[in-house]
């Protein structure tokens, strides 16, 4: 993309040196870079992908808490107010919470928008630039293969972080393995709901989903895989065949496919070393229970950008020490992840899902701290914004 730099600006006194280099044009990486650039740092983002939004590996579903951290253009989203939770026998419950919603997104478009915003803040973005390693010499981080140096390096390069590997930092060791297909938008999918399927034969340790997305229908599932070297993979075709009675997906045009590991073991240790810090998926900032990480990418990406700026500009506290205190612990959710990974039998799920305790638990999982069951779904209301993707708001 011609609005992103291909090489350092030769007009700068030291064009190959930056205050901060961010590895990974991820949600966390771009938010951190934008924040640091707004605060006056000279920032570079490097990413091996050819352009922002390429090879996306996330469903891009935002919980309301994530939306509150970062304003996304409405034209790139679709609002969903409820969750329909299916038992293995295909009976279901509908869940809502007053004032709560999810946003399905056109994720590649969101990434392109966020990259433009980061560049507009003053950061230099280098796509097609692969991180191969770095060393810290005399309080300076050097990336010899890219002929770049920095005062600080931030690893936001995903679940299998090369930055973590090259500096001997903590690495993710527990994963879900996810697979998703984007289909053309189909009228057989009720747009009021995230459709979530519990089935420990087809999706042991997690679930399957059908999402009325922003201009598409997203269908996927993930399975608990423990160590990434294990052989278990999602049986996507079996899952689609199982749910076809509801959505008739086999005749729909496929627009895109994606797959990859989702860290679910909590925050890694150690997070940092001298002049180097991890954030986002690289740091394990993904809920072990729900596998959601964008909320944490927004919140802590912004915080990391601020803390690094204070450290470099004002003699502030070491960013690694600050974020080790501030990153979430995920204690209860880690235990719940281990319990669900044990894959309770489908017969038990069929019996338990419709009991008040299980419905209350599902309400808490989907709608955070907003307890209580809501039997009536919110009224649809027209929205003044002309959004070509939105079925309702």
Task: Please provide the spans of the model-predicted regions.
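FAD/FMN-dependent oxidoreductases across multiple families
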Residues: 131-133, 227-304, 313
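Glycine-rich FAD pyrophosphate-binding loop
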Residues: 21, 25, 34-56
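Beta1/beta-strand and adjacent pyrophosphate-binding region of the FAD-binding site
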Residues: 14-28
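N-terminal FAD cofactor-binding segment of flavoenzymes
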Residues: 52-84
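C-terminal helical "tail/cap" subdomain of flavin- and related membrane-associated enzymes
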Residues: 306-393
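Active-site substrate-recognition segment that forms the wall
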Residues: 197-228
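Conserved N-terminal helical subregion
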Residues: 69, 78-166, 173-176
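Central beta-strand plus flanking loop segment that forms part of the substrate or channel wall
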Residues: 60-61, 160, 165-196, 249-250, ...
């Amino acid at each position: 993309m011609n609005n992103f730099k291909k090489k350092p600006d030769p007009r700068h006194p030291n064009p190959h040196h930056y205050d901060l280099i961010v590895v990974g044009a991820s949600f966390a990486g771009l938010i951190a870079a934008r924040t640091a650039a707004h605060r006056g740092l000279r920032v570079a983002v490097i990413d091996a992908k050819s352009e922002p939004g390429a090879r996306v590996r996330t469903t891009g579903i935002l919980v309301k808490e994530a939306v509150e951290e970062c304003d996304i253009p409405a034209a790139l989203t679709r609002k969903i107010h409820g969750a329909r939770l299916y038992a293995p026998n295909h009976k279901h419950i509908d869940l809502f919470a007053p004032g709560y919603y999810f946003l399905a997104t056109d994720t590649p478009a969101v990434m392109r928008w966020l990259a433009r915003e980061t560049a507009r803040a003053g950061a230099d973005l280098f796509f097609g630039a692969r991180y191969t390693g770095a060393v810290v010499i005399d309080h300076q981080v050097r990336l010899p293969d890219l002929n770049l140096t920095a005062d600080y390096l931030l690893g936001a390069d995903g679940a299998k972080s090369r930055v973590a590997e090259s500096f001997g930092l903590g690495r993710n060791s527990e994963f879900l393995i996810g697979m998703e297909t984007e289909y053309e938008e189909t009228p057989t999918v009720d747009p009021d709901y995230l459709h979530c399927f519990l089935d420990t034969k087809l999706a042991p340790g997690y679930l399957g989903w059908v999402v009325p997305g922003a201009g598409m229908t997203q269908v996927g599932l993930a399975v608990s895989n423990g160590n990434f070297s294990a052989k278990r993979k999602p049986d996507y075709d079996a899952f689609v065949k199982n749910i076809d009675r509801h959505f008739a997906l086999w005749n729909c045009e496929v627009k895109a496919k994606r797959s990859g590991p989702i860290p679910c073991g909590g925050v890694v240790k150690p997070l940092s070393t001298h002049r180097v810090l991890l954030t986002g998926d690289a740091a394990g900032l993904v809920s072990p229970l729900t596998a959601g990480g964008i909320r944490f990418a927004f919140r802590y990406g912004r915080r990391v950008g601020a803390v690094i700026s204070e450290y470099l500009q004002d003699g502030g506290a070491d960013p690694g020490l600050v974020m080790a205190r501030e990153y979430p612990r995920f204690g209860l959710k880690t235990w719940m992840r281990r319990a669900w990974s044990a894959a309770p039998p489908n017969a038990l799920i069929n019996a338990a899902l419709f009991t008040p305790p299980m419905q209350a638990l599902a309400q808490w999982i989907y709608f955070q701290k907003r307890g209580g069951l809501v039997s009536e779904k919110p009224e649809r209301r027209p929205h003044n914004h002309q959004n070509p993707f939105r079925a309702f708001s």
